[in-house]
Amino acid sequence: FFETNIHSRSYSHIIRNIYNVPKDVFNTIHDTKEIVDMASSVGRYYDELHKVNCRKELGQDVNEKEHIKAIYMALHASYALEAFRFMVSFATSLAMVENKIFIGNGNIISLILQDELLHKGWTAYLINQVVKEDSRFAQVKSECEAEVYQLYLDVIREEKEWADYLFKMGPVIGLNATVLKDFVDYTAVSALKEIGIRYNSPAPKTTPIPWFNKHVDTSKKQTALQENESTNYVIGVMTDSIDYEELPTI
């Protein structure tokens, strides 16, 4: 929750620095069908687990296998979020940095990306470990293989649709919807392999976005502090309201 709060504040900071009236952007988020669809497709697994947990808290009879399955599917939903859901947006934002645009914002996004990759590693460990240590989870795994794989296929398809949505007005230098969709497939191979799943769709053997790696491993980025702003999380350094009298006379 601490990191999530930092991420939320960081994104808010970025939007405030770009738009004069940021609330207009925030207010349209839930009106964007593509965003709502992506949230609901994964969110339903959390909703299902929440319902089962509530029934158990109320003392109602809860089938143990149903509960185990709800936990297992929610873990995979979390992994889908960390491994796939944000990658197209991350790559698009960082492409601007590669074109020397919004560099300060890109540095913040690089930090958030690194956090998400840590979450991905932790979630993969949990998925692999519960199956090893608990025979009930091992049984659910064998029974739900097709459902789990379909979960990932749905998220991957939605990410590709998001790439089309982002670039519906045209490409930016060095990036377009086709490259991004190849990047999603490339990412899927290693991400699914990490949790013991084979990705059966065609995918590039090498990354379609080579520069993305330096944002994952910041030790590969060499920038003197005086040439760029610090990558510490910063909020509230910009304002969209200023009185004319405050401006210096020239």
Name each model feature, range by range.
Residues 1-250:
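Non-heme di-metal
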